[in-house]
Amino acid sequence: MNNNFKIYIVHYQALKERKKNMEDSLRESEFSYYFETKFDRRNLNEEDKKKFYGDLKDSYKANFLSHINCYKLLSESSNNFALILEDDSPPDRSFYENIDKYLRKLPSDFGMFFISAGKNNFHIPIYLRKPFKRIYKKEDKPSTWGGAGASRNADAYFISKKYAKILYDEFNHNDFTTDTTIDWWMNDVIRKYDIPVYWAEPVLIETNKFESSF
């Protein structure tokens, strides 16, 4: 696979330091990038909130909607896949030095490819790792080391245009509502459509560089 992709950054505008750190990281790179800021937790309207029920906080709703809008933008673009980052996950030297090697090994029919350990610090266990192997197929079943399914939080992941459109359409179905966060919902959709999911190990993006903003 080539590295012709765009980076979409889910960003909460009040956190200006995060944007600066992200821009400092990306400015010298060859990648185009875009800050997704359409949905602000401080002023979501009733239309924004209509897909959610229960006691989910507006911060999680805004985050969820931001990922969904990234899927929309990718599905309407000329790119075959994109990298989605949350604003606490700026790439560092390891990402730039290794991304080409990882993408060359990633199957072309991938659906999602998680490249950070996420806020839950999920890793492929040492007993499952193989020498020189960097890309691992992740089953959609819960595990003690990998959470409730195939997602790996939502801090840093590639997604293909095909499956971005599927997730976008699933969210926008007339009957759809949810009471959960984007990464938990991903697991439901991954299972429903048998989306091929892969994890990077070693990871390419370090997360948890800031206190949680949720």
Predicted regions and their residues:
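An acidic/histidine-cluster motif and surrounding catalytic segment
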Residues: 1-85, 89-214
